[in-house]
Amino acid sequence: MSFEEVYEELKALVDEQNPSDVLQFCYDFFGEKLKAERSVFRRGDTITESFSDGDESDFLSELNDMVAGPEAIGPDAKYVPELGGLKEMNVSYPQNYNLLRRQSVSTESMNPSAFALETKRTFPPKDPEDLKRLKRSVAGNFLFKNLDEEHYNEVLNAMTEKRIGEAGVAVIVQGAVGDYFYIVEQGEFDVYKRPELNITPEEVLSSGYGNYITTISPGEYFGELALMYNAPRAASVVSKTPNNVIYALDRTSFRRIVFENAYRQRMLYESLLEEVPILSSLDKYQRQKIADALQTVVYQAGSIVIRQGDIGNQFYLIEDGEAEVVKNGKGVVVTLTKGDYFGELALIHETVRNATVQAKTRLKLATFDKPTFNRLLGNAIDLMRNQPRARMGMDNEYGDQSLHRSPPSTKA
Amino acid sequence: MDTTAVASKGSTNVGSSTDTLSTSASLHPSMNAGSVNEYSEQQRHGTNSFNGKPSVHDSVGSDASVSNGHNNHNESSLWTSGIPKALEEATKSKKPDSLVSTSTSGCASAHSVGYQNIDNLIPSPLPESASRSSSQSSHQRHSRDGRGELGSEHGERRSAMDGLRDRHIRKVRVSQLLDLQRRRIRPADHTTKDRYGIQDFNFLQTLGTGSFGRVHLVQSNHNRLYYAIKVLEKKKIVDMKQIEHTCDERYILSRVQHPFITILWGTFQDAKNLFMVMDFAEGGELFSLLRKCHRFPEKVAKFYAAEVILALDYLHHNQIVYRDLKPENLLLDRFGHLKIVDFGFAKRVSTSNCCTLCGTPDYLAPEIISLKPYNKAADWWSLGILIFEMLAGYPPFYSENPMKLYENILEGKVNYPSYFSPASIDLLSHLLQRDITCRYGNLKDGSMDIIMHPWFRDISWDKILTRKIEVPYVPPIQAGMGDSSQFDAYADVATDYGTSEDPEFTSIFKDF
């Protein structure tokens, strides 16, 4: 490339971009040119490149390239002396992005193994109609999405009814601690917000709620962030009508129910997995990885989980309910219940399912598949394959490769 | 004839590959010199500071034992016992030459002891004979395959094979390195309590504030060196039900020892407050640098990410989750290397999973938000957010409304800016992976999936760990002068430090 060509190119760029710092612009331009040319040159001897284990000189030269790298060219970046080798680069921040330091958040520390020992708190059951209505209210909220039927009811039963007789009562005040989540049963509430950051509730109460934002009607909820952690309330909610009824749920009760159940389920998984002979070559840590990976699936009565003759790669544990094992020509050979498992050989071998498993009642299963197993534990499969017990599993009493009953001791 | 010719060519190649290894080996003595120099600063802190208090001696002794104790493979045992036994065995098995550098300095810094060992081991990641024979056989296979082919094609094939073998060697080297760094831990009876008192320090300006207190720059009245003291208000901790987190923070920081993790020198308390004496990282927060630069070029982000990854790997292998990764908690030391600070949410997770929601909203993993018990995989998610934020200048999930933010995280849709390289996008898509059974760091190879990812191909991990790599940015500070120019100014408030009337909660915080 001749000098004239380089000059022409640079001139065209300068004319086009009209940089404020011309010297810096030229510097970046030549740096870029040089780097491009060198990289072409380097490509010639890739063999030595592949041998270098991130050669230091390479790394350094590339660090130097950062100063005048392709990313730092022209209008994309600005030279700031205090930044040393670094530069101020162009970024299009998301709208309203807060560039300030971010505060950590935390719930109260909780130890589920401790409260598993305590007696479970029970709440008086609510009217089924009320439950249905409450459930509909929170259906779209992600905090409630992972709850299954019985835990859902448990959480909703833990909600307490509150009556607010008059209009103009503040249920939550901006800046105050957030401990409760509310669902409106009857009446309407207005939401107001002060624009100031970090305003105290005292200031809000003494000098006004601020700008009107929206109105909350029956069936809607507010204050849901309080279920996650204690953050200052972002707005105030004030009753608009007289004779209001709301349901309140506090964070501690909510999280306790959720994690108590999660903990019980986890303990159940771990104990069930311990009973599966084929997994006995795994250590505790590996079994925990599987317990982490188990997915809950629910089958309605009558639906088929696996079908004889299909090729399967999933393993199932029965968490709740009953399942019937049906063999072609033989009818129901056995009924499996909570704590039983089936399909475990699919984890090691490509197996053809030798029987059909059908849900007899509503059936809650925990399942994971062979690809997941491979990803998480890899060659642990080889260990399992060489186990005599794994081979034994193939000749169990039903003469079935993919069905197995756990010892009676696991049945709770 | 043909075969032998190529085979001999192969063997010269083996020669050159062992050369590569020995070159790096020959680099190490100088590296040692460097690292001793670098750490001599810390040695001075350790030996001279706070006169007459043998602060570092105990930790050095056991450190050597741990890094030498090859029998100490069981991670959990690090937390329980076996330290004296390991020490005994280590003294037996110590090679005399590995002690040279440690004895010259009298009380060698913990770091140089550890890395001396690493250096001794690195040159032979594979048993000498094994590495030779395996590479040779691969070349022989080659020669058979390659017979009759054109020279150029042959060359390409050979380089592809070499590339594979090279990757394997690199992987073995890196895993050996990680293995060593993971075993460095201070003994369980390492006490931090009452080693210092408020009278030992002159409290200077505030470096940062948090929910329970603030961090001060302080000067030691004994050795005149500068430190940072984190002051926590006991009543606030109790009110906000963070007792367990605070006690865990002290315990974990008193046990960990890693180049990229802040050092806890000691703790003490007065009637109302807890005090934690730590290193003063003079370069300020990575957060401030990032906001000034707006975003980092890939090379810079990669450098900081690499240091964070080594620290996380170390913590995880010692059964600790960190849980609050973000640029605000990464400080730069005077050389421009990272120090992870604020272990307020760190937790030991040997057996159980975590279920306390904690962290920083932008960095929370989906499993934490959706109220599932979670584990170390959540830290790797946060690493993904951190890398994204360094490259883009802003985090991948953002909303002013926290509930909307959490919905975005659960949805998991990431928009990668056009200037992200394909390799970085590939890595991030494996870290910002909602399904923890697919998330890098949590799979069968653990952190190796991240460390060996192509995005880090030009990172030399042993040089990162020994801090023998040129940093992308050296903080413009006057080292050792208590220069806090890299920190934001905070309004100073009247403090009640040192009061002894009505001591509160002393039984709860008895270890401070």
UniProtKB/Swiss-Prot annotation, chain A:
Coiled-coil region(s): none
One term of GO molecular function: cAMP binding
UniProt: 3',5'-cyclic AMP 1 binding residues: 143-277
Region (Dimerization and phosphorylation): 1-142
Top-level taxon: Eukaryota
One GO cellular component, as annotated: cAMP-dependent protein kinase complex
Keyword Repeat assigned: yes
Sequence segments annotated as region (Disordered): 392-412
Residues bearing the modification Phosphoserine: 104
Record motif Pseudophosphorylation motif, residues: 101-105
Keyword Nucleotide-binding on entry: yes
GO biological process: adenylate cyclase-activating G protein-coupled receptor signaling pathway; cellular response to glucose starvation; negative regulation of adenylate cyclase-activating glucose-activated G protein-coupled receptor signaling pathway; positive regulation of protein export from nucleus
TM spans (from-to): none
Family: Belongs to the cAMP-dependent kinase regulatory chain family.
Subunit composition and interactions: Tetramer, composed of 2 regulatory (R) and 2 catalytic (C) subunits. In the presence of cAMP it dissociates into 2 active monomeric C subunits and an R dimer.
Protein name per Swiss-Prot or TrEMBL: cAMP-dependent protein kinase regulatory subunit
Organism: Schizosaccharomyces pombe (strain 972 / ATCC 24843)
Swiss-Prot record, chain B:
Enzyme active site: 324 (proton acceptor)
Any GO BP: negative regulation of gluconeogenesis
Modulation of this protein's activity: Activated by cAMP.
Protein keywords: ATP-binding, cAMP, Kinase, Nucleotide-binding, Phosphoprotein, Serine/threonine-protein kinase, Transferase
Domain Protein kinase: 201-456
One GO molecular-function entry: cAMP-dependent protein kinase activity
Matching InterPro entries: AGC-kinase_C, Kinase-like_dom_sf, Prot_kinase_dom, Protein_kinase_ATP_BS, Ser/Thr_kinase_AS
Catalytic activity line of the entry: L-seryl-[protein] + ATP = O-phospho-L-seryl-[protein] + ADP + H(+); L-threonyl-[protein] + ATP = O-phospho-L-threonyl-[protein] + ADP + H(+)
Positions with biased composition (Low complexity): 16-27
Similarity annotation: Belongs to the protein kinase superfamily. AGC Ser/Thr protein kinase family. cAMP subfamily.
Protein name listed in UniProt: cAMP-dependent protein kinase catalytic subunit
Source organism (scientific name): Schizosaccharomyces pombe (strain 972 / ATCC 24843) (Fission yeast)
Source lineage: Eukaryota, Fungi, Dikarya, Ascomycota, Taphrinomycotina
